A protein has these predicted regions:
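Conserved catalytic neighborhood of penicillin-recognizing serine enzymes
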Residues: 95-133
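Active-site SXXK
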Residues: 48, 60-90, 123, 261
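Acidic helix-start/capping segments at beta-turn-to-alpha-helix junctions
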Residues: 84-103, 139-140, 206
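Mid-domain, small-residue-enriched loop/turn segments at the edges of structured enzyme/sensor domains
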Residues: 133-194
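Structured C-terminal helix/loop/strand segments within mature extracytoplasmic catalytic/sensor domains
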Residues: 21-33, 137-138, 142-143, 184, ...
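Bacterial Sec-dependent N-terminal signal peptides
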Residues: 1-22
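Beta-lactamase-like hydrolase cores
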Residues: 17-57
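Extracytoplasmic
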Residues: 33-37, 54-56, 62-64, 83-85, ...
C-alpha cells in the first residue's frame, strides 16, 4: 500500500513539473525574440505553485511604485494618522504641466480640495503623477515608503525619487525592484499581512478599477476577468530605447484561485504595440496554464 501511495505521489509531482516545463517553454518562446530584457514571476496564491524567468532582474519601477506608495499611505490610515475622508488642499503650483495628470486636466486652476480617497483613486486607478507626488509629500516622502516596504521583509526594492524628479534618462533606473520581490509584496498584501482587512479590500478594488494598460496584461485575459493591477512605462531616449514597461497584478481564475503575475521589461527597442502584445501573450499563456490544469 505504501509503495502504491509513493508511486502515486511521484506521478503527481511529475505531472506538475511537466506542466510547469510546458509553461516555462511557452513563456521563453514568447520572450526569446524580443529586443528587451524581460523578467517574469508567477505564483498561485492558494496552491503556492510558482514559476519565474529572470525573477531577480533589477528593473526600473516607474509607476508600479504607486502601489507601494498606496500601501504606505493606507498604513497611516490603519494607524489613525490619516483618514480617507480628510480633505487635502491642492495648490495650482502642484499641478505640473508636461506630465500625466487627470487631476490637472479636470481642475486646471488648482487651489481646491480632494479627499484622500479621491487622491488615492486618481493615483492608483488612473496613474496621476501629480497626485502621486502630493501623496508622497503628505506621508513624509520616499523614505517613508522605503522603510515601510523593507519592514514587510522586502529587500529588493529602492525608491528615492518622486515622479517630478524622474526627468532624466538616468533617473529612470534609480527606483527599482525585481519581479520576485513584486510577487512577494503582492502576495502578503493580498493575504492581509500588510494592511487591515478594510484597507486591503479598498486598495485591491482601486487596483481592479485601474484604467491604464488596457492593451497590456488585461488584453491577454478573458473579458470580465477580475484583475487588480498597476502599470508602469518610461519615455524613450534619442536612440529609441525605452527604459521600462511593466505590468504587475493579481487575477482570479474560474476555480477561485488567484494568480500573481509580475512582468518587467527593461531596455526595450521594440515598438510599443509589440511590447504591449508581449505582456498580453505572457498573461494569456499563464491563464491557459492555470485554467487547463
Amino acid at each position: 500500500m505504501r509503495r502504491i501511495l509513493l508511486t502515486f505521489l511521484i506521478f503527481l509531482v511529475s505531472l506538475k513539473i511537466f506542466g510547469q516545463t510546458e509553461l516555462r517553454q511557452e513563456l521563453e518562446n514568447i520572450i526569446a525574440t524580443k529586443n528587451a530584457t524581460i523578467g517574469i514571476s508567477i505564483k498561485n496564491i492558494e496552491t503556492k505553485d510558482t514559476l519565474s524567468i529572470n525573477g531577480t532582474l533589477n528593473a526600473p519601477l516607474m509607476s508600479i511604485f504607486k502601489f507601494h506608495i498606496a500601501l504606505a499611505t493606507l498604513n497611516l490610515v490603519d494607524k489613525g494618522k490619516l483618514s480617507l475622508k480628510q480633505k487635502i488642499f491642492i495648490k495650482k503650483e502642484e499641478l505640473h504641466e508636461n506630465t500625466w495628470s487627470p487631476i490637472r486636466d479636470e481642475y486646471p486652476n488648482g487651489n481646491m480640495y480632494l479627499t484622500l480617497d479621491q487622491l488615492l483613486r486618481y493615483t492608483v486607478s488612473h496613474s496621476d503623477n501629480n497626485g502621486c507626488d502630493i501623496l508622497l509629500k503628505l506621508i513624509g516622502g520616499t523614505e517613508t515608503v522605503q522603510l515601510f516596504i523593507n519592514k514587510q521583509g522586502i529587500k529588493d526594492f529602492t525608491i528615492k525619487l518622486n515622479e517630478r524628479e524622474m526627468q532624466t534618462w538616468e533617473s529612470f533606473y534609480i527606483n527599482s525592484t525585481t519581479p520576485l520581490a513584486t510577487t512577494e509584496i503582492l502576495e502578503i498584501f493580498y493575504k492581509g499581512q500588510v494592511l487591515k482587512k478594510k484597507t486591503t479590500k479598498y486598495l485591491y478594488q482601486i487596483m481592479v478599477d485601474c484604467s491604464r494598460g488596457i492593451t497590456w496584461m488585461k488584453a491577454g485575459l478573458p473579458e470580465g476577468t477580475e484583475l487588480a493591477h498597476r502599470t508602469g512605462i518610461s519615455d524613450r531616449n534619442e536612440n529609441n530605447l525605452r527604459a521600462a514597461m511593466n505590468d504587475v497584478g493579481i487575477f482570479k481564475i474560474p476555480n477561485g484561485n488567484h494568480i500573481i503575475l509580475s512582468v518587467y521589461l527593461k531596455n526595450i527597442t521594440e515598438e510599443r504595440e509589440v511590447t504591449e502584445k508581449t505582456i498580453a501573450d505572457i498573461a494569456k499563456a499563464t491563464w491557459n496554464y492555470y485554467t487547463n490544469k
